[in-house]
């Protein structure tokens, strides 16, 4: 691959007892057509075969760091950022993986006016007997990026991001507070958007995101999301605040709905139907009707 400028990219991969996934993630980095990279695996002292998996890759560009992160994945990512020697940091979760052109397809667009790349991912839903696939689609954010990210919600997947290390240093890395677990990435994008609008969307599916039942994806994210966005709310006007509030309420309602806890979600959904963006309004109406039918006909699932 003939890329005129090929600065070093540091791939930061936090992991904990994901030996059964980690090999796939590392192989996808090894397969990159853009070859000037280093991969830093930050392991929270796993008790599985993580060490053997990393050691099976003899490429000197792959290194292993051990830390105690006390259940806070942000601490692992921060350790990787500190250790990174690259101009660019690329985040990759250990259960996700990239297509071989991912780094090239992003970095061929690099110039002084781009600070942050992101793209679409294929979502692989792990189910008892099969995988279902759909696209985790993103879009080009409108300027000011910060406002669009707040009002539209987090449309940026962690394993799609490549960002300048210097900017992560400028915002003092990722927030490690317990309250924000699961939404620390969203908070990071918001804080980066405070200092740069140079977010570049690559409209291609360049990797895979694994959604599995044991993951953070199953938790009620509305509380962590509130922590992630609270300090930015004063920047919004009244209409924008209502949209953000409806996002929080929809997130809470959706979790309750998936857990079949229908009693408390009607008020949340009514608010969403009044104030949310069109897509959330439609989802809320659908959910509201589903709840109504389930309670009317006594179906518990």
Stretches with model-predicted labels:
Residues 20-23, 48-56, 97, 101:
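Acidic helix N-cap motif at the loop->helix transition within catalytic regions
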Residues 28, 35, 43-52, 69, ...:
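A conserved acidic beta->alpha catalytic loop
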Residues 1-30:
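N-proximal low-complexity "stem/linker" segments adjacent to membrane-targeting elements
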Residues 205-213, 217-243, 264-274:
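Catalytic core of nucleotide-sugar-dependent glycosyltransferases
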Residues 140-220:
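Conserved nucleotide-sugar donor-binding catalytic segment
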